[in-house]
């Protein structure tokens, strides 16, 4: 997997599967991503170094803002508009996953001994 340049810095996929993705991101001081949402993916940010602000838009267009430092984690639910801003040069893990339906089993018969 290869690094990809972004306007705000670099992203490097570490793991990509149908159910989960993990990217290492390096964001330049002052760098920010677009305001966006994911239809079905949950998006988490775990800061390794630096300072990353996560903005999340809630009901009535109100914006909640959380500043993350090394060791901090923030989780953005699927469908929620969000954006990140680096207040220092920042390295973080960006983790995506989809909720699994734990009742998605159809049994043809019953197990036994």
Tell what function each PLM region has.
Residues 1-24, 32-35, 66, 70, ...:
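A short, N-terminal "cap"/entry segment at the start of jelly-roll beta-barrel domains
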Residues 58-79:
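Short acidic-glycine-tyrosine-enriched beta hairpin
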